[in-house]
From Swiss-Prot:
The chain crosses the membrane at residues 18-38, 55-75. GO terms for biological process: bacterial-type flagellum assembly; protein secretion. It holds the Pfam family Bac_export_3. It is a multi-pass membrane protein. It is found in: Cell membrane; Bacterial flagellum basal body. Role in flagellar biosynthesis. One of its GO terms (cellular component) is bacterial-type flagellum basal body. Its main location: membrane. NCBIfam families: fliQ. Keywords: Bacterial flagellum, Cell membrane, Membrane, Transmembrane, Transmembrane helix. It comes from Clostridium tetani (strain Massachusetts / E88). This is Flagellar biosynthetic protein FliQ. Belongs to the FliQ/MopD/SpaQ family.
């Protein structure tokens, strides 16, 4: 197994991980920022006010993008297993 193959697998794994986690992270950041702005303007400092909307948003985004995430992760796993099978031969 050459260095190029290892680097390719690692690059695919990192890019897939970033791609799969991006929708949930971005939605949580946006909702957290909006709630923080709302809290700053109204001077409400309740900690659960930021937690509950982020939790609901992450659950909904996970529900709507879960199939796509699973498809990407299974594709990466299949590529890695095919690479392992080619190395063993």
């Amino acid at each position: 197994m050459s260095e190029n193959m290892i680097m390719g697998v690692m690059r695919d794994a990192i890019s897939t991980g970033l791609l799969v986690s991006a929708p949930i992270l971005i939605s949580a950041i946006v909702v957290g920022l909006l709630i923080s702005i709302l809290q700053a303007t109204t001077q409400i400092q309740e900690q659960t006010l930021t937690f509950v909307p982020k939790l609901i948003t992450v659950a909904l985004v996970g529900l709507f993008t879960g199939n796509w995430m699973l498809h990407n992760l299974v594709g990466l796993t299949n590529r890695i297993f095919e690479l392992i099978a080619n190395i063993v031969k």
